[in-house]
Amino acid sequence: IETITQTPEQCAQDVDAVLIVDDGSGAQWKYAEYPLRKGIPTFCDKPLAIRAKAAAEIGQLARETETPFMSASSLRFVPDIIQLRRELPQLGNIHLATAACGNDLIYYGIHALSMIYAVLGPGAISAMNVGRPDTNIARIRFKDERDVVLMVGERARMRAGYQINLYGTNGWKTVTPNLTDLYTYLLEAFLDLVHSGNESVPIEEEIEVIAALEASHRSLELGREVSLSEVLQAK
């Protein structure tokens, strides 16, 4: 390493782009403020924020400064998920789908839910979690008459891994994606954004994913259905 800096701001000087990795705080979004204000293309590791409102604020800054900005799960870009998206028309209309993974609801559930978004697109409006603190079973309702069941179990409950199931009017499909080189595909998508301006994952969509996860978490705490608008407006 030729240059060692003392602050994140110094690290973002005289560079072509900024990569912000997950520091375990769930608040790495705060390191994006400086490069975004300087107009430096920025990638922020998932989850952009634990709270949807914080994610929305940094997303608004990216739009206001017109700076290329990306935050996304690497599972959006693995070949198996890309191929599933291509095969979607063969399955007919999808009104029911499931996604599952092990570990924490937000930190790892974002990968499972991102597979759903990569294949079926956005549109979540509410979540109802009928699971337990260590075994989440969240029904996420979408505005296009689609329901997605997101199952995320802590390590004591299930092993790590990812799976997506689509139940269409013409056929069903189950995919357990191959995760080989998954970070390579993610970085390729970011470089494409830097070079061409092509947004593979609009920041508004990533904010919605975080809002759906937060709504799922709050639903379990409150014992009721929680809308995405509720978490986005929370103080």
State where each predicted segment sits.
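A general structural signal for well-ordered alpha-helical segments in protein cores
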Residues: 28, 55, 81, 112-113, ...
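C-terminal helix-rich "cap/oligomerization" subdomain common to oxidoreductases
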Residues: 10, 14-22, 193-235
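Beta-loop-alpha module in the N-terminal Rossmann-like domain of NAD(P)-dependent dehydrogenases
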Residues: 2-60
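C-terminal substrate-binding/catalytic lobe of Rossmann-fold NAD(P)-dependent oxidoreductases
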Residues: 134-190
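Generic hydrophobic alpha-helical segments
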Residues: 32, 84, 189-190, 216
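A contiguous active-site-proximal alpha/beta segment in oxidoreductase catalytic domains
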Residues: 43, 48-107
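Rossmann-like dinucleotide-binding domain that binds NAD(P)(H)
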Residues: 95-159, 204-211
